[in-house]
Regions:
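Terminal amphipathic alpha-helical/low-complexity segments used for targeting or macromolecular assembly
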Residues: 1-105, 166, 171, 177-178, ...
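Structural signal for interior beta-strand "rungs" in well-ordered beta-sheet cores
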Residues: 43, 101-312
Length: 340
């Protein structure tokens, strides 16, 4: 928990914003709008939360200029209060760093090259011909396979696994339990030998400024690398199959599954539990709402959904029965139209 203290004037200068109120008033933490106290700063990002502001007394509120009259206390006027909140969160709670040393329990191959300022935590394993860039932190229990390259200022949290020949760019964060570069799911059926494994000959390339959530898995490609481009963000429990390509700046929420050789364009938004079939192309700036099942190419940017919204269970059962009768109903309707 942060023990830092900042004045209204200091925070406004940090954000590059104007302020109103007591320049010397200090706060020590960020809090939700609904219950922020005099020693805390909060933010108002949307009109629908104005009622909450009326019922609370925060030390400082970050809000848009159009909302400035809604609060008479200390306030910072920001064009984007939510973005301001993101920047403040790092100011109040900077992440702790590992000591810039190799822990004595770590196993580092003699051919591995670790740049200045690399930190390696307990029980890590770093394989042959690995290269790790300046300022990167490798937390406890992480395994980095042979000939893998990790860029500058990355952070690999405990128990990350990077298989052989994976390439990670600069300023990449990978959370605990993520596995990058495991074999893609490739097998050829044989009448005599069952499923014959197809060796996955390519690898995984992760760009710069990427964040990958806990227990996410990104498989290596069969013949073409699996690619995540610069600035993409991937939540927990996501699976990218072999040969998938994720465009620059795309955001993927939890539990998404993308089948092999699909290309997702730049600046796309994928809601939770979206499923995308293989060998598809998704246009830049496409948005899929949570639970959407994608089975065809999307060539036009837009907002798409396919999941049925929640209903009361009795209505859902009736509608489910009717859904199974649609083909018969359509046949009967055509028959009636012909008879008229």
């Amino acid at each position: 928990v942060s023990t830092k203290s900042f004045s209204l004037a200091e925070l406004a200068e940090f954000l590059g914003c104007e302020y109103r109120g007591d320049a010397t008033h200090r706060v020590t933490a960020i809090a939700p709008l609904s219950d922020a106290s005099d020693s805390q700063i909060t933010f108002l990002a949307q009109d629908k939360y104005l009622a909450q502001l009326a019922g609370t007394s925060p030390g400082i509120v970050v809000l848009r200029e159009k909302h400035a009259a809604a609060y008479s206390g200390n306030r910072i006027l920001a064009a984007d209060p939510y973005l301001a909140y993101a920047r403040l969160s790092a100011l109040f709670n900077p992440r702790s760093s590992l000591p810039k040393e190799i822990h004595p329990t770590a196993i580092v191959d003699s051919s591995a090259v670790l740049a200045d300022g690399v930190a390696v935590g307990p029980n890590c394993v770093i394989g042959a011909n690995v290269r790790v860039g300046q300022g990167t932190e490798i937390h406890a229990g992480t395994v980095i396979g042979e000939a893998t390259v990790v860029g500058d200022n990355c952070r690999l949290y405990p128990r990350v696994t990077l298989y052989d020949r994976v390439t990670i760019g600069d300023k990449v964060t990978i959370h605990s339990g993520a596995v990058i570069g495991a074999d893609g799911f490739g097998f050829a059926p044989s009448k005599t030998d069952g499923w014959v494994k197809i060796e996955q000959l390519a690898s995984v390339r992760i760009g710069n400024n990427v964040e990958i959530g806990a227990n996410t898995t990104i498989d290596r490609g069969a013949l073409h690398d699996t690619v995540v481009e610069d600035g993409a963000i991937i939540d927990n429990l996501v699976h990218l199959a072999h040969g998938v390509s994720i465009g620059e700046g795309t955001a993927i929420a939890a539990c998404v599954g993308i089948a092999g050789s699909t290309t997702v364009g730049k600046n796309c938004l994928l809601g939770g539990a979206v499923g995308i079939s293989g060998h598809l192309h998704i246009a830049d700036n496409t948005q899929f709402h949570g639970g959407t099942v994608v089975t065809r190419h999307v060539s036009e940017p837009g907002s798409y959904a396919s999941a049925a919204p929640m209903q009361e269970v009795r209505a859902w059962r009736r509608n489910s029965v009717r859904y199974t009768q649609l083909d018969e109903m359509a046949y009967r309707l055509r028959k009636l139209e012909k008879e008229q």
